[in-house]
Amino acid sequence: VQEFLNWTVDTIREDRLISPWLEEKKYEWVPLVSKSVTNILEKGRSVLVITDSDRDWFLKYVLTHINSQKKNRPFLPFYNFKSFYKDLDEVKTEDEINFIKDMLNISFPNGYCFWYIGRSQDARAILPKFSKNSFLWIFDEEIQDAFNLKNNDEALDMKLLQMFRLYDKTLSASLFAEINVEH
């Protein structure tokens, strides 16, 4: 079983489709991914994926590829949050947030976590930002316990695809006990 930080660096270096920029962010990446993978594989939590509207394409990409039959692994519990609650753009009050959380607690007795990809100030970010165990890829704001990116980065779309590729490889390696993501 390889140590997670070293495995991450080796994977970035060996995969010609992942650029070196991600290696420079390894100390941000590793603890966030470790927490996310542990939530799924160790704690049995489901992942509710949310993006801002500019990243709807990425949401479709993630959900199409995460459980692809080509992966030769068990399907993992990743869901489009909009399939549970369509009016996320309209959530404004604490009561609405609590009603949604109550529904999710009933629906997911083992627990759930959010994976949010998008602008920090977007209405869709409210629920994930204030929920524990969220996996956050946040744009245009430096937030602790989030992977921070810039919305005006010309390479942003490519970076998202590379990050997903590394995350997906991490899920497989963890699932097949090639690495241990826990510290």
Tell me the role of every PLM-derived stretch:
Residues 1-183:
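Conserved N-terminal alpha-helical segment that immediately precedes and caps sugar-phosphate-binding
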